[in-house]
Amino acid sequence: YLLWIVLFCNVTAGIGILEDASPMIQDFFKGHILAAAAGGFVGLLSIFNMAGRFFWASMSDFLGRKATYFIFFTLGAILFFTLPLTRGDHLNSVPLFVAIAAVIISMYGGGFATIPAYLKDLFGGYNVSAIHGRLLTAWSTAGIVGPLIVNGILDHYVSNHLNKQDAYPQILHIMCGLMVVGFVANLLVRPVAEKHWMAEQNLAPVGPGH
């Protein structure tokens, strides 16, 4: 259940960026970002999403899965908190905004790619498929909750004739909070107690005909 929370928080926060990436960069830097450039930004995030799966999964082989998620949530919380400061009425830095968003999305992809190995480390290879199938409900749930959070807040600002640009810091700070929750859940993950290990004779043989 702790790993469910870990994956849910990581994916929800990542979707919070992907869900509204193009409008977000245009609203952050009004009049400076064309629609075509915003589309290119979304394409760049897709590349970092894919690259992050290779990079972070490989790094986890050296750092360990728990330590890798420690980086995801610690760095993620800092980046989500910092991202609103890049907008036009603050630092006004498009390159910094793009760089931060790209790193966040790389960790979103990396978290999804690293979780099967995390499961194997905790439960052994024999149980990974069944447990991973259940864990994917966290991804499905995050795919619903993430857009609900983002669109719910944006709709509130638009319907009340408020400045839409002011909605994004609130959204990103919620994602920062999710990073903190995920950090705590990951911190509490412990190896399975030896008393729950399956005896070797109880494992079904694997081979032709099975």
Per-range role (PLM):
Residues 1-57, 112, 116, 143-151:
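Extracytoplasmic gate region of multi-pass secondary transporters
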Residues 8, 43-47, 74, 102, ...:
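Transmembrane alpha-helical cores of Major Facilitator Superfamily
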Residues 61-73:
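Cytoplasmic membrane-interface "Motif A"-like loop-to-helix N-cap segments
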Residues 75-90:
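C-terminal ends and interior cores of transmembrane alpha-helices
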Residues 94-110:
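Hydrophobic core of transmembrane alpha-helices in multi-pass small-molecule transporters
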Residues 122-159:
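A late C-terminal transmembrane helix in Major Facilitator Superfamily
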Residues 152-177:
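A membrane-interface helix-boundary motif in multi-pass transporters
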Residues 174-205, 210:
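Multi-pass alpha-helical transporter architecture, strongest
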